Amino acid sequence: YAESEGEILKSFMQKWAQHREMVAKMTDIVRENGLFGLQAEEKMMRWMFASREEKSGKLWRAINNDNVLECQTMESNSVDLIVTSIPFSNHYEYTPTYNDFGHNEDNGKFFEQMDYLTPELMRILKPGRLACIHVKDRVLFGNATGDGMPTIDPFSEMTVFHYMKYGFRYFGMITVVTDVVRENNQTYRLGYTEMCKDGSKMGIGCPEYVLLFRKLPSGTSRAYADLPVTKNKSEYSLARWQIDAHASWKSSGNSLLSYEDMKGAGIDKIRHLFRNYEREHIYNYEEHVSFAEELEAYGKLPKTFMAVDPVSKKPWIWDDVTRMRTLNTKQSQKKRQNHICPLQLDIVERLIERYSNKGELVFDPFGGIGTVPYCAINLGRKGLSTELNYDYWKDSLSYLYEAEMEVSAPTLFDLMSDAV
C-alpha cells in the first residue's frame, strides 16, 4: 500500500480487530446459551409422521410410512431377502419428522431407534435367508470434534454388533472400493497440498461395506435355508464358481504396460487398459506410482476422479462398481430432487442375483427412490419397499411402473403364439 493510504490501513485494521472481538463474544454467548431461537423454530416445524399411503403393481409394493410401524404389520417369515442402505446414524436427516432415523443426537440414540426395527426384520425374514446391509464409516471433521483433524467413526463395526444382538449371524463383509479423488473433492480432507505440509495428519479414503447377516434356518445340522437359494449348473458352472470363489487370475505374459503405448488414447481407454493389465500381472507399487506420474507429466491425470485406482483380485472386494450408475441419474434427467445417498445399482443387482431365487420377494425398509425393488423387478423378482420421505416415495413409483412395464411387455413372438 502507498504511504498516502496509511490512514485507510489503520482504519481497516481497527475494524478488523473489532470484528474479531465481536465474533469471539458471539461464539462465547452461543456456547453458553445455545441457539434457542433456532431450536424453537425447528421444534415448531418438526412433526410426527402419522399418515400411510401405498401403491402397488403385479410385481411390487411401495409404501410411504414409518418402516417400524409397517414391519410390525407384516407376516413372520414372509420376506426372502433384505437389501438396504441404513441411514448413517445422524449424518443426514431425510424428513422433518420425529420418526426420521437421522433425527438423533448421536450413535447411541440412533441405535436405540434401530432397536425397534431390527427385531422386526429378524421376524419377517425367512429362516436361512440374508439381510444385506450397506454402510459406510463416517468422517468426523476436526472443527466439530475439536481435534483439528478428521477422524473416522467406526459406524460399520457398531452396525455389526447391533444386528448380532438380535440373533442375526454375521458371516461376511463385502468391501466396495470408492474413488479417493472424488471423495476429497467433497470433503477436502485428503488434499495433496496439505499432505505435503504434514503427511502425519492424513488418513485414507473410506470404502463402503455390505454387511452380510443370516437368520439361522430351522435346522442347523447342514445349515441349508428352509427354502435354499439354488443355482442351475447349466447356467452357473463349476469353473465359474471356482473363479468367483478364489479369484484365480492367470497372466497373459504381456510386457510391462507403458504410457508410451497409449499416450494418444483418451482417459477412458487408458483406464480400461490399466485395469486389464493390473488384473493379469503381479502388483508392483513402484510401477503403479510411476505410471500415474507419467500420466501427470503428460497432463492426463484427472483431479476430479481417480483414473488408475488399485485393482482388486479378491471376490469380496468390489472395485468395479459404477459410482454414477444410480437412479439419481434418472432423477437429474427428469429434473427431480436427487437422493442424498443413492445406492449403486451394481451393488443391489449382485446381491439379489446371488442371494435370492427368481420370483422371490426382496424388501428394502429404507426404500429411498426405489433402487432395490427396481432392480428386483428387472431381475425377475418381486419388490417391496417402505419410505418415510414422501417425495422420494412418489419418485420411486415412476421407476417401479417403468420396470414392470419393461419386464411384462409382450414380444412379437408372444403375440404370434397367442394368435396361433
Stretch-by-stretch model annotation:
Residues 57-395:
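Core catalytic lobe of class I
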Residues 11, 391-402:
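Short alpha-helix adjacent to the SAM-binding motif of class I
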Residues 24-33, 223-228, 407-416:
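Short, flexible loop/turn segments with low-complexity composition
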Residues 13-16, 150-151, 189-191, 401-404:
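Short, hinge-like loop/turn segments at secondary-structure boundaries
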Residues 31-38, 230-239, 417-420:
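Amphipathic alpha-helical surface "interface" segments used
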Residues 48-70, 398-420:
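S-adenosyl-L-methionine
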Residues 20-24, 87-90, 94, 404, ...:
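Short amphipathic alpha-helical interaction/hinge segments
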Residues 1-47:
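A conserved SF2-helicase RecA2
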